[in-house]
């Protein structure tokens, strides 16, 4: 069996092995999309293949749309060359269910793939043609948060960006420069309206995309390389929109155990490819069943009816509330708590931690008892139901190969948002008492204990990458098991608003955090004993 147009001609063979196949006339959809494209997506990675492409397939299967998806890749051209095109833009989605079963779907809603290469006249010419079409309603992105950045870590312009500012929209080299150039083509073709929709997992993502595109428009206009009207076009809400969105679906990299399932089905050409840019790609993608995509309903040229596929459309304030609900209460804090204590207790799978009665009780109390009373309720999603799904379906899913070590990455950058906002909400509330927070301070103390890089058995372990390690690790470097006179040593961290979002002394949580920390460093086995004592 081969994943291609030819290989899928024998539908019965695929269906006999349990595959759900496209139920629409793909040739007709391909032709309609080529003539009148509606939606192009930048970023041909796993989240797109597992989520947006499958949503579109379900809508096409029901005959509720006539056009499919076009995908463009601008970071790693080999994804298109080595994965999309050899398989005629088909891919296999393996949905990993919490009960241990899998669902296998051949996704065929992507009917054209493009390479975002301004040096390649054929590829770039086709993208310009797409951007000139009146029918185009939505340009979406999953290019990661750093994909929108025009500067390096020191705040200096990236060389490709600086060169593009000077050279203009003709043949840009940077990713956002190319996107801005394509938007300029649309501007030149009658100032046609369009929605530019970031679907990356970062707060206020539409603003990040706008800031990047707007900067290019301004620089080109300043340098006489584009009309001033192009800046006005980018700023005109009736012509170009940059909606906010919130996305949530875990799509780990293609897993060997999933590959084995598909190999048993005798599908050829499944081997993953590591590209020269170190992207790990395969003809299949594995993902959890749960998915959420909430988009601000701001589409100057109309939009596809993606609500028919489960995507939610609402106003900006509600998108913001959904984001805060997820990041500050209902998912991310629970993940971080499990990550910190999982590393200390020697776990290598997040799902295994949910079989640990004490760790489970800890995150249940952080979510339901401490977080929910001050949660931001967005209205379109129920926060309690969201936590229920996180704790009973998503995190315990044994098929999701997620690790506490991965989630512990950059914890110093996460504590202020994931826990500090809840602390601030308690402090601001007239009827909530900060003294009711018992387990959030335990996570704070747990992170300080984690920084010692010694697990609960007294064995050294490697800390996950974090930009502040060089600053924070020396604070705990002199602390040993059994020390009790530690408060003054850790005070610089407890007062650090950048880390915790508040000064823990001013918030009234420092005393409890210090007490917990002393108990956590009492000796080998103290981490387990402390969790047991307080949950």
How would you describe each model-predicted region?
Residues 1-42, 46-535:
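Substrate/ligand-engaging "lid" and interaction regions
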